Amino acid sequence: MLEGTVDYDPLEDITNILFSKESLNNIDELISITRSYKKQLQEDILKEENELKEHPKNSAEIEASLRKVFQDFKETQDVSASTELTISNLTEGISYLDIAKKNLTHSLTLFQNLKILTDSYIQCNELLSQGSFKKMVSPYKIMCSLAENTFISYKSLDEINYLLSSISRLKGDTLSKIKQNYNALFSGGNISEHDTALTMELREGACELLDCDTSTRAQMIDWCLDKLLFEMKEIFRVDDEAGSLENLSRRYIYFKKILNNFNSKFADYFLKDWEMAVRLTTTFYHITHKDLQTLLKREFKDKNPSIDLFMTALQSTLDFEKYIDVRFSKKIKEPKLSSCFEPYLTLWVSHQNQMMEKKFLSYMSEPKYPSNETESLVLPSSADLFRTYRSVLTQTLELIDNNANDSILTSLANFFSRWLQTYSQKILLPLLLPDNIEVQDKLEAAKYTVLLINTADYCATTIDQLEDKLSEFSGNREKLANSFTKTKNIYDDLLAKGTSFLLNRVIPLDLNFVWREFINNDWSNAAIEDYSRYMVTLKSVLKMPALTDASIKQQQEQPSTLAFILSQFNRDVYKWNFLDKVIDIITTNFVSNTIRLLQPVPPFSLAGSKRKFETRTVVNIGEQLLLDLELLKEIFHTLPESVSNDSDLRENTSYKRVKRHADNNIDQLLKFIKLLMAPLDSADDYYETYSKLTNNNPDSAVWSFVLALKGIPWDLALWKKLWSAYNLETDDTDEGSRPDSNRDLFIFKWDKVLLGQFENNLARMQDPNWSKFVRQDLKISPPVMKRIVSTPQIQQQKEEQKKQSLSVKDFVSHSRFFNRGT
């Protein structure tokens, strides 16, 4: 428990001993033990002190032994130093002998290498005099290696310096000798063609010798290339007629002869890894590139440069580059010769106008409609136009080497836009029948109009891809986009005009007869036994053939106008969108003719004025119209079935959209007819029916017009009674001041003009009581700054049709098929 250390902490033992209250009972015993232990320790200390006093001699003995240890250590050091000196004296002679051995070995090696160098030099000298390059390769390589790597550091020695000078002269003589042989070869002296021995001597001998020194080899290659191209450089000087731009093609032809001659006669005399043909072509490129820059700069100093000459030179250069690229698999790294023409490429782009003018002459003379009915229903000239564009674009990108050149790309974009606009004006727009010419043959007019739409769509969507392609190489995409903006708008306008023509001038030719039958029908005596005659005619007019071979053959002679138009569209998206618009036109016509049939004849509320139809008759008419709507719904549901022969047609999103659109229109018509038939016996019941069918429509003009169409007499008391029930649930908003965009016009949204006429006539009632009711209760006032004049029905329909002009964004999808017609 008690520790014999100076760091002893008594608190730990005290804590352990007195860890509980019970331990206090033994406190006396603990104190007694502690005192006894303390006494024992004091006795031990005294005993140790006494022993130290009794034996002081032990310290002296320890000191003496330490002195003895240090003395022995000093003696050992002295012996060690003496031994080391003795050993050094013994090995000194051995070190001298080792150094002498190394020097002797090095001297022997040096003299051996010197002998080899001398022998190689002598041997090379003899072989050179004999012209034996192949045998000379091995000693020559040894000689060059030793001279450059071993003895160059001993050049200060006269003998070595003399030998190295002799070797240098030998190298020069070797190069001269090799040049003599190649000169004789190129000049066609007494050397026989395809001399095998000479071939081996030059290729495996002379070329191997030249490979020993990079600078010598480069010098020799340049000398050979200069020899091979000497005549060409002399003939085609830029200051001579032969070297002019007019004779550029002759320069290329001449070089081809040089290249072919080299490959057939001289290529075997050089090592393959030298690639002499590639070097020869690269040197020609370098020379011609410099000459071309001079010639083109000189040509365009003139205010009237020859564009034909420029184009001829450019075309011959492009043809030559293609030839070289094919021959050498694009190994030529020298800048292309066509890059010299790049600063003047805007002239090249403008020169393409001549080509396009010729193209347009052929476009205007060829048949507008494809001769083969199975062909894509676009003008063949449009596909040819974009093939031409693609060719021009490809050539331009080759000329600028696929690098960004905004000025050229902008010129190209303007070129494309210009001729696309010309194409729309000269080729496409004439396909559209002018407004001042009556449609004589609706199928013929429809055929060419759909051809216009298909082609304009092809052009419009392809313009986007053309713009994207140009943008890939341009640093100014916005500027390129601006170049195409006007063109895109022109084609969008063409699409809108073509679609509007079909909807407003072709389709109505059939529908007008239907609505004439509607007007001529004896509505006062509606029998309500079968569908009305006008509706049967409408079904016949809109009849769509089933998509089977047999039925198509049956319908080929006289298809319905709608069926013919849908069959001519090049893409299903146009068919679906066109059906959407036709459904809206029929719905609008149905509403307009129903309103005209039932609307009161002004002036209103005159004494003794009678309504066209009594309320009871209007109910009978409504019942007949409900029956007719059943057939109209059937007709609308039949239309989408003929768009495509796809087995999954009913799962098609467009099919579902068109069918849902038709159902929504029919539902609106049903609510309108049911409202016309709603009884007026109870004002509250009528209000409940009205609110349910019009979705709580708050517009007082709509409420008034519906009452007027129901044939209710001009009995102010009856009108106020019905109004009181209606007015309790509506707010006090001034309907006359509410903007049309915020008004819920119910069924009259399809013919706002008729609603406006009714409001105008109602607000101008002369009877003071009626006038007060209209202005204060109904809050209807004449339209401000606007005069609405009643027009004959046919003229009114034409005004409605003009409203059908479509935005191309509502009718055209943005799919792309740039590669069509390729």
From Swiss-Prot:
Keywords: Coiled coil, Endosome, Golgi apparatus, Membrane, Protein transport, Transport
Membrane topology: Peripheral membrane protein
Ranges in coiled-coil conformation: 34-58, 460-484
Pfam families: VPS53_C, Vps53_N
Keyword flag Membrane: yes
GO cellular component: cytoplasm; cytosol; endosome membrane; GARP complex; Golgi apparatus
Domain of life: Eukaryota
Compartments, record wording: Golgi apparatus, trans-Golgi network membrane; Endosome membrane
Job of this protein: Involved in retrograde transport from early and late endosomes to late Golgi by linking the vesicle through the t-SNARE TGL1 to the Golgi, leading to the membrane fusion between late Golgi and endosomal vesicles.
Family: Belongs to the VPS53 family.
Subunit text: Component of the Golgi-associated retrograde protein (GARP) complex, also called VFT (VPS fifty-three) complex, composed of VPS51, VPS52, VPS53 and VPS54. Also interacts with TLG1, YPT6 and ARL1.
Name by which UniProt lists this protein: Vacuolar protein sorting-associated protein 53
Protein source organism: Saccharomyces cerevisiae (strain ATCC 204508 / S288c) (Baker's yeast)
Organism classification: Eukaryota, Fungi, Dikarya, Ascomycota, Saccharomycotina
